[in-house]
A protein has these predicted regions:
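Short N-terminal edge-element motif at the start of the domain
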Residues: 379-434, 438-440
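Extended charged low-complexity segments that act as oligomerization/scaffolding linkers
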Residues: 1-347, 435, 443-610
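Charged, compositionally biased non-catalytic regions
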Residues: 331-403
Length: 610
């Protein structure tokens, strides 16, 4: 195991707290019979054997023991592959993990989905699930339904890391894997690896119980917990996921500390604050901000960022991924491939000065282009982290969205999460083909009486030019923009025809052809690149009517489509809400532009400070 994989495993050991074991061979008794009550006074006065003939009762006792042994034997026959529950749970406990145990009691002809639905809630909190393949009468349908219910639950809740270990005595694990893969019928899943079905956040893996005659996949119960944790570690194979898991583990570990810090002795203070402020609902946000601040403090004190993202972790990551990285710096047809130690140093210390000094010694012909790390050459040099499956550019787009947005349309999973119109809300106007950012102060977007005029800054599409925002777009935006583009093409073609008719079959306005060629180049992928206009006069003001809660609430029309409608029934597609500081920065530029003062001064003097 590499140093980086060991680092990830240590974080997994901190994070994983709960495991659910589902097996019909768990060995739990179906029922317990109460012992007959004995009156001790009567027992003392009684004669153990009133008659020697009572010795015959001993034969009855022997018969009873034989009967119990026979029943136990029959129970073992019903369970083809029993589970050594004690060894398995003790092995998890030794690792500090709570192992829950469930032995299904499946009723005759019980519907599969009804049974699986019962498991759904209890399994939702388990990081790892150990599941037997056949839970009754050589029937795998119940286990497959459980897996599907768990996957559906994870999708509906916004996703989570999950490892499911199919632990069975059945042979032909490849066939079992393919059977489950076909049953799940999910295009996001991959079954190309042996004994495995996986996706970005899911790992379903097949192992055999002891005695199954498959030495390659056989794992004893006391060894299974370590195997399960190794499988879970595969889901955390990255710097950023290990950081997120380390932070989550720290919050889990400090849950008691957090709750005691926010104790009931603060109730009176909170209520006092609520009754004293002009708008009582503001007190709820006040407490939320205090809670978030306290959690951030816990993470900072624990140095979670440094441990998971610092120099040592970077060194381990580069060592682990070096064979798969591009490592090549290219400029003007020349290139240089970085050595391992060089890539580690650049990753730890950055490009500034370091990249220029390196190339000045190793590849002088391209070194000068990297002397100023703020120039485009250095920006393109991040391709050293490209792999066969992904690029640093694509990764940077995703991180820029994460750092700019509180949430986007991709993050809304529940009806209670539907957004309302507020400062920082980004929408797309279907009728005007414009991207608009709400800049109305937050306090003016709540407690609305009937209707309110909202102000929006216009964000210009700047594909191929300088941009300050990357925005994910849904299919509704793509379809609308494509329709507008096609309509515009038809208009230009009509203008070209009219131009030639008017000019006797000759073209006079060649700019129309240029416009048509530009429209034909238009492509609509998963992102739009925008630049915020700082011109105050470009602001748009639109009136929206509020709901009963005195806010302008969006309408969810499909899984990825949420819209606002103004008082004239124009549609605005919600794309996301920016982080507060990101919004304030853009509003600040607007205000600065508004406050510009033009001074007519001596040109010689003006050039001294320009």
């Amino acid at each position: 195991m590499s140093a980086f994989r060991t680092h990830c495993r240590e974080i997994v050991d901190e994070y994983v707290q709960t495991v659910l074991i589902i097996d019909d061979g768990a060995g739990l008794k179906h029922k317990v019979e109460s012992a007959e009550h004995i009156d001790m006074e009567d027992a003392e006065n009684a004669t153990i054997f009133d008659d020697l003939d009572d010795l015959d009762d001993l034969d009855d006792l022997d018969d009873l023991e034989d009967l119990e042994e026979q029943e136990d034997s029959e129970d073992q026959e019903k369970v083809t592959h029993p589970l050594n529950t004690l060894d398995l749970t003790n092995a998890f406990y030794d690792l500090g993990i709570v192992a829950g145990l469930y032995q299904p009691q499946i009723e005759a002809e019980q519907p599969v989905d009804e049974f699986a639905q019962k498991i759904r809630k209890v399994s939702s909190t388990a990081d790892i699930i150990i599941l037997d393949w056949m839970l009754t009468d050589h029937d795998s349908s119940y286990s497959k339904a459980i897996v599907k219910q768990i996957l559906d639950q994870d999708k509906e809740s916004g996703g989570r890391l999950r490892t499911i270990v199919i632990y069975t005595g059945e042979t032909s694990l490849h066939d079992k894997r393919d059977e489950l893969f076909e049953y799940l019928d999910d295009q996001s899943l991959d079954n190309s690896d042996d004994y495995r079905i996986s996706s970005e956040h899911l790992n379903i893996v097949f192992y055999n119980k002891e005695g199954s005659n498959n030495q390659l996949r056989e794992v004893a119960e006391h060894e299974l917990p370590n195997k399960a944790l190794e499988e879970f570690t595969l889901l955390v194979d990255g710097l950023v996921p290990s950081f997120a898991m380390k932070a989550s583990a720290a919050i889990r570990y400090n849950t008691g500390r957090i709750i005691t810090r926010f104790g009931k002795e603060l109730d009176a203070a909170y209520l006092s604050h609520r009754v004293l402020v002009p708008d009582p609902e503001d007190s709820e946000l006040f407490m939320l901000e205090n809670f978030v601040s306290y959690m951030r403090n816990i993470l900072a004190i624990g140095r979670i960022d440094n441990i998971a993202l610092g120099a040592k972790s970077i060194q381990n990551w580069v060592n682990h991924n070096f064979p798969h990285l591009n490592k090549k710096i290219v400029h003007d047809g020349n290139d240089y491939t970085l050595e391992l130690e060089e890539l580690i140093k650049l990753s730890q210390d950055g490009f500034h000065q370091n990249l220029y000094q390196l190339l000045d010694n190793k590849k002088t012909i391209i070194a000068s282009a990297f002397k100023d790390a703020s120039k485009e050459a250095s920006l393109k040099a991040i391709s050293i982290y490209d792999t066969q499956d992904s690029t640093a550019q694509e990764s940077s787009r995703q991180l820029s969205i994460l750092s700019a947005f509180k949430r986007t349309y991709l993050d809304v999973t529940d009806v209670n999460e539907i957004p309302y119109l507020t400062q920082g809300t980004l929408v797309y106007s279907k009728s005007d083909d414009k991207f608009l950012l709400c800049v109305t102060p937050k306090c003016d977007t709540v407690r609305i009486n009937k209707s309110k005029r909202f102000s929006f800054a216009v964000l210009d599409e700047v594909n191929g030019k300088k941009f300050d925002m990357v925005v994910p777009i849904n299919n509704a935006v793509r379809v609308n923009k494509k329709e507008i583009c096609e309509n515009r093409q038809e208009e230009i073609i009509s203008l070209i025809i009219d131009d030639r008719i008017i000019n006797g079959g000759k073209t006079k306005d060649y700019s129309l052809y240029d416009d048509l060629r530009e429209l034909e180049k238009e492509e609509y992928d998963d992102y739009i690149y925008l630049a915020t206009s700082s011109k105050f006069y470009t602001l748009e003001h639109i009136v929206f009517e509020c709901e009963e809660n005195k806010r302008v609430l969006g309408f969810k029309l499909s899984s990825d489509l949420i819209e606002f409608w103004d008082q004239d029934c124009n549609e605005y597609i919600w794309l996301g809400d920016l982080h507060d500081l990101n919004t304030i920065s853009r509003v600040g530029k607007l205000v600065t532009n508004l406050n510009r003062t033009g001074v007519d001064e001596l040109e010689w003097l003006r050039r001294q400070y320009q």
